[in-house]
Amino acid sequence: MSPTESPGTTTLRHRTVLLDEAVDALVWRPDGAYVDGTFGRGGHSRAVLARLGPAGTLVAFDKDPAAIAEAGTIKDARFSIEHASFAEMGDRLAGRGPVAGVLLDLGISSPQIDEAARGFSFRFEGPLDMRMDTTRGITAAEWLAQADEQDIARVIRDYGEERFALQIAKAIVARRRESGDGGALATTSDLAALVAKAVKTREKGQDPATRTFQALRIYINQELEDLERGLKAAYELLQVGGRLVVISFHSLEDRIVKRFMQAHARPERDADPALRRAPLRAADLPQPTMKLLGRFKPGAEEVAGNPRARSAVMRVAEKLGEQSA
């Protein structure tokens, strides 16, 4: 998912990134069962349904109540929606049989950013919420009001790759102490202003709060944990020949996806010390269980029309059968 700015305005509108490429890679059987793990505003789901035959089906997942409401506008018997993280697809789809493909379009969508009340963006004044699912869980403001300095620094460093994480954490705790209440950082503007003061060196073309907001969003929504669980669940659900298509927008996500696919496509004999010393035939070595079908980036035309698509990376893999190696 990627937000984009309309020409001449600061209003964000949603534009599905790598739409045709993702659907082309995903749908290889018009009569197959498919999963869209990140419905968003339905761009991919609608395109998948357009490719499916009468016997094809699509189950979508999303944590965002607004996405669930949008999914309700799709009047198609082949389509259903689950109000849940894609990490739960294994449990939710248990007993339905294998699927022909799973699509994950990671990250945050422009409608989520554009709605100030969600608290995802430092560009809009709003409560510091940041939850994908507003019906459950702790908000970013609530977590910052109770977390200790070490935990705050760790989250900002690990999930935001922010080199000033410790300084920002110290400033947050100091602000909390000075205020005498837990609501010292209640709004997006509160946090953005604090980070701007704590970060002395600015990255060209990037607001100093960018990495901190990303880190908190990822942590509050357990995005990386969900991704790891979701990849495993997707692999288990896929039939032989089934496709796993994942679009990511930052290096933390892409590294997880890359490692997962490569671990299945290129099993290492080095993973077992005993295998390193053993004179083995090729047939005795660990066999690949997925085939890598490529890594794709948006073309120049798409990036020109939607600059924020520049960071998108799509990886595609196919599940192999036991005799495919």
UniProtKB/Swiss-Prot annotation:
**Record key words, sorted:** Cytoplasm, Methyltransferase, rRNA processing, S-adenosyl-L-methionine, Transferase
Tell me its family. Answer: Belongs to the methyltransferase superfamily. RsmH family.
| PANTHER family in the cross-refs | 12S RRNA N4-METHYLCYTIDINE METHYLTRANSFERASE, S-ADENOSYL-METHYLTRANSFERASE MRAW
What taxonomic lineage is listed for the species of origin? Bacteria, Pseudomonadati, Pseudomonadota, Betaproteobacteria, Burkholderiales
Q: What does this protein do?
A: Specifically methylates the N4 position of cytidine in position 1402 (C1402) of 16S rRNA.
Enzyme Commission designation: 2.1.1.199
What is the protein's given name?
Ribosomal RNA small subunit methyltransferase H
Q: Which InterPro entries match?
A: RsmH, SAM-dep_MeTrfase_MraW_recog, SAM-dependent_MTases_sf
Q: Main localisation, per the record?
A: cytoplasm
In the UniProt record, which is one GO cellular component term? cytoplasm
Where is the protein found, in the record's own terms?
A: Cytoplasm
